[in-house]
Amino acid sequence: MIQLTILFIGILTTFSACKKDDKTIPTVISTGNDPNFTIVANSDTGFSNFNRKVVVFGIDIYAVATVEDAKLLHAVNIMAQYLDNDEDGTVDNQLVLNKMLENKAFLVMWKNESDLNIEPPSDRLGQDLGNDETHPSFVTNGNTGPFDASLEEVLHIINNAGHSFAYPNAFGQNIGSDLANAMDIARGGQFMTIPSQYPANAWYTYYDQTCDYASCQTIEYLYWALTSMLGAQENRLNEIDNEWRLNTRQKVEDTDTAIFSILTNPIYKMPTVLPDGSYKQ
């Protein structure tokens, strides 16, 4: 993931209401071959770099012309599977989706960094995902090979625009939320700035100086915990242990009891199956 110029800060952006641009990109758009979703031409205000989009339960996923259709549709299916994890055609947690819709949540898919030189409306919350970091075969190959960043970036926007607003006491990106309290334990203390060295007993040790306590560290922590519980990190310990050490469900359950309790609370209806990009197929 990279940061959108000016407006993208850390892993999220605050972006305002949608109307159509006068200028559209005169490109023939393939509708794709997905049985559940259709690629359509895009002309939404603030997204003129992106020639097409797919709408998933009301959430816009935009792509520039150089993003592969297969990768766009893969991200779409990942979004659908996170939101409707049992794939019965109805989102599992309507409150979370409602908050995403209120925040006009979106995902933008890019090929080159310059694609992110955009100015989305100011009341929209967004996240970016790169074409070349999207690897549809990761899960179907037994969670091996190049990691599929759609598992991270799609989850970020759901957590940021959805869970944080639907359940502020539990998932609020602020000191004192259940999520932040659990994170403080995982980091070995409450660090408002990145320490030069985390305590030896910490298992979440993110050293990115651009990642602040609230809007970034909390969301990254939530991603690591949930995807580890879903199995995405089981073969990646050597790649990720400089940042996260509990790469399996059992390790999270045994060591990070606070976050495990939150994520298994049936009230929140968190995903229990790792998306593989094959929604209702």
What role is predicted for each listed range?
Residues A63-A70, G142-P146, Y207-I219, E243-K251:
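Conserved aromatic-histidine-acidic binding/catalytic patches
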Residues N33-P35, A41-N42, G46-N49, I78, ...:
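Generic detector of solvent-exposed, compositionally biased contiguous segments
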Residues V56-S196:
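Acidic/His-rich structured neighborhood in mature extracellular/periplasmic domains
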Residues Q3-T14:
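Bacterial N-terminal signal peptides
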Residues N33-A63, V67-K71:
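Start-of-domain marker
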Residues T13-F37, Q281:
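Bacterial Sec-dependent N-terminal signal peptides
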Residues G162-N238:
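Post-HExxH zinc-binding segment in Zn-dependent metallohydrolases
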Residues S215, L222-Q281:
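Pan-zinc metallopeptidase signature
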